[in-house]
Each structure stands twice: as C-alpha cells, then as structure tokens.
Amino acid sequence: LQQVIGLDNEGDATDDDIFSSKEKRKVGDKWPVNKKNAIEDFRKDDIRIDADRFKGETELAGVVKVKGIECYRLTGSFDAKQFQPPVPRGFRVQESGLTAKYAGSFPIDTNLPELETTVDIRMYFRASLRNVELEFDRRLKKDITVTPLN
C-alpha cells in the first residue's frame, strides 16, 4: 500500500506500521488505521491533519487465490476532513478533503511479495488570499499486479 502513503525512507513509518494489526485476525475482522503514524507520514509532505478529523480502517475481507497462490485479501479506506495543505504563506484554506480506498492481495507465504494492489485517492482543497483563489482537485487511481519470478 505504499502508493497510498508514499515510499518508505529510513526511519519512516512503513505501510505495516500504518495499516496492519498487531493481533491475529479472522475473515471479516476490521481494525482502525494507526492514526498517529498516518498523520506523521502526511506531515513529511507538509500536510497537517488534526487527529479528530482523520479516520480509517482496514478489513481482512477474505482468503483468495491469485495465480494459484493463496492470499489474504485486505481492503480499507481513510478519510481526512479540513486538513491544512501546503499552500503559500498567507493563504487561508476554506475547504479541504482527502479520501482513499485501497485493497491488496498478500500471500499467506510471507516470503512472496504482495500480488495485487488497487488504490484510489482523491485530494481537494480551496484556499484564498485577498482576490486570489486557489483550487486543487486531484484523483489518483492505480492498479498494480506483481508476478513473482520462480
């Protein structure tokens, strides 16, 4: 799920730090996204999110076969309202939102890589300074399939 948050740098929170569960789970179980780690990860890109305006969860949706390999199917989403985007000094943000939906197929054999990932992210905001209005609305959708080498 690196496409959701970003590529990991030394010392940064990993996707497992943000989306995984510390407990064993069964199909149908849901758990919250690690809000603290997610918000810190966005902060690296100068996106400021208040904890009370961020929510997200991940679900173990099932066990599926992908290319004959048994995988856990994880799905999830997160949402941030009224965040502070990186806008020029003096601009006042009137409205902002960030939503993401994601899914992935993770082999039960942890030596194998994630085989499928789907990510759909939308970020928008509107800000102004005197007569100048700044609007941003971007949607990124990715479908990634991995074929392990023998």
Feature roles, as predicted:
Residues 1-26:
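PEST-like low-complexity, intrinsically disordered acidic/proline/serine-rich tracts
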